[in-house]
Amino acid sequence: MDRRSFLCTAALSALATATTSPLLFGQSISQRQPIFGRRRAQRGKNQQKIPIAVQLYSVHRLAASDLAGTLDEIAKMGYDGVEFAGYYGNDPKDIRKMLDNSGLKCAGTHTDLRDLEDDRFDRTAEIHNILGGKLMIAPIVPYSIENALHDVDTNKRLAERFNVMAEKAKPYGLFVGTHGGEGRLVDGIPASERFFNDTVPEVVMQIDIAYFMSTGGDPYKMIEKYKGRSKTIHLKESGRGGPIIGSGNVDWDRIFSLCETVGGTEWYVAEDEGSADDFGRIAACIKALRAMGK
């Protein structure tokens, strides 16, 4: 089951059972050695240290069976936070206690788009304030829904929906955004560029580096062009066989330099969907990132 189906199934289940309970959302390591450090000596003094989280969907079966234990293990690996994709039936207040006990922060969530609109928005925002995470990211590739990839007007209407959500988020001190990135064209312009051209600066651009590159997108160009909008970015390696971060095709020095100078990045979020019931791959991810000086 992919993350979109996972979140949608979780959302429908939660809505079916919700009465007085809180709303519940939505929801072989490569032998090649990491490549890093080619331009580290050239980094400017204005670059900042950015905390690293992991997207919990990477180990969602472990999180579903023991969320507190999973958070503790993630903290021991050296991660600074986690990004949620569903709450596994737990009350947000209890999750906040788990986070505090483990020493982790909430880097944000992947939240079903339906929970960011209409009468669900306020409850969604309240839960994020409980968790201490201010980034509410729609985990789908929104440019492709409702045939937006092939329709300029639909793409624009989708952007308008996010502008409304961004305005509603302001009183809560929160931000909404989209996950993924789409390099395919809408009337001659990459869908993601068209979308972010039509949205206000407060709409966050969470690029999934590997996915975006797979659609022909240029993540380096996007971070540079939409300055300050990459408050969060998914660090996922591109290449055959699902390589660990640092052993594929991504120019990580360039990504980090852009994020730390013009991207406005507040969280790096590692994601590796190679094994949902094993800590090995996300442990390898944080090890590689720390070796890169992150």
Language-model-detected regions and their locations in the chain:
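A cross-family glycoside hydrolase active-site/sugar-binding cleft signature
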Residues: A53-Y57, E83-A85, A107-D112, I137-P139, ...
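Histidine-acidic metal/acid-base catalytic patches
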Residues: R4-S28, R32-A53, H60-L71, A75, ...
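Short phosphate-binding/catalytic loops that engage adenosine nucleotides
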Residues: Y79, L104, L174, G264, ...
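Active-site mouth loops of central-metabolism enzymes
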Residues: A53-S65, H110-E117, A148-V152
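Active-site-adjacent beta->alpha loops and helix N-cap segments on the catalytic face
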Residues: G89-M98
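Active-site acidic/histidine proton-transfer and metal-coordination neighborhood
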Residues: A11, A16-T19, Q42-G44, G81, ...
